[in-house]
A protein has these predicted regions:
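Conserved acyl-CoA
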Residues: 47, 188-201
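A conserved beta-strand-loop-helix scaffold within acyl/acetyltransferase catalytic domains
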Residues: 52-62, 72-179, 219-220
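Residue-level preference for non-acidic, small/hydrophobic
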Residues: 110, 187-190, 217
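Conserved donor-binding loop and adjoining core beta-sheet/short helix segment
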Residues: 2-34, 39-50, 54-74, 149, ...
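Active-site/acyl-donor-binding loops of N-acyltransferases
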Residues: 58, 68-75, 201-237
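Conserved acetyl-CoA-binding loop-helix of GNAT-fold acetyltransferases
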Residues: 179-191
């Protein structure tokens, strides 16, 4: 089994940034031949890495540090008025955690979400292979949060369990349920689940000040950012 001392990393060639127009980005990847167990994955996450399928990566741009890893210390979180409304609005839904896997039911929801919400992104068009390589392959202690309206699957969130927290990987929802704010609801549920499991953190990936679609992450307070190798509460002013 690999460890931090023996890991080999690779950097991609510069490519167009997916988040900030006109910028070039470089990504650092863990050697895909490395054997990454839950303990090593947890260490990598605390250093700002993310998982996408069987790949572990973090931004490694020469002249830009806009991508900031963020996490929430769940025991300090108190929902604001808007988040309490989201919880109340979705109190009729059922949530359950199941082992991450491919099913046509999951893929149907995923494909509708990508086609109707992200047709201008690099995940379009969706495919079964894409779903599997992104959300199922490489899983260590990986789960899907099913969000159900009676028997209808209306939301699906990929969640990894780490040594000290949960990592929110990706969430999709039924486009016709947009008014339910299921993305926010999924995060609120994961916060509650982390508390129930007596875990300290919910990792929310990267926050980019110039990317409006990531603004929602800073609505969960107090949020911590990894800067200069140290996690610290993010100053919102």
């Amino acid at each position: 089994m690999s460890n931090l001392r023996t890991l080999v990393f690779f950097a991609t060639p510069a490519h167009d940034c997916s988040y900030i127009p006109g910028r070039q980005a470089t990504t650092m990847f863990v050697d895909p031949r490395a054997q990454v167990d839950k303990r090593l994955y947890s260490q990598l996450t605390s250093l700002g890495f993310r998982r996408s399928g069987s790949h572990y990566y973090r931004p490694h741009c020469e002249h830009c540090n806009a991508c900031v890893p963020v996490r929430l210390k769940v025991e300090d979180f108190m929902p604001d008025r808007s988040q309490r409304r989201v919880l109340k609005k979705n109190s009729d839904l059922t949530c359950r955690m199941v082992t991450a896997s491919f099913t046509e039911r999951y893929y149907d929801l995923y494909s509708r979400y990508i086609e109707q919400r992200h047709s201008d992104g690099d995940m379009y068009p969706p495919s079964r292979e894409q779903f599997t390589s992104f959300l199922v392959e490489g899983a260590t202690d990986s789960w899907f949060l099913e969000i159900l309206d009676q028997d209808q699957l209306v939301g699906l969130a990929a969640v990894d369990k780490l040594d000290e927290g949960l990592s929110a990987i990706y969430t999709v929802f039924e486009p016709s349920y947009e008014h339910r704010s299921l993305g926010t609801f999924a995060i609120l549920w994961q916060i509650e689940e982390a508390n129930r499991l007596e875990l300290s953190y919910l990792y929310l990936g990267y926050w980019i000040a110039e990317c409006r679609k990531m603004n929602y992450k800073t609505r969960f307070q107090p949020i911590e950012a990894l800067r200069d190798g140290h996690w610290q509460v993010m100053d919102q002013h």
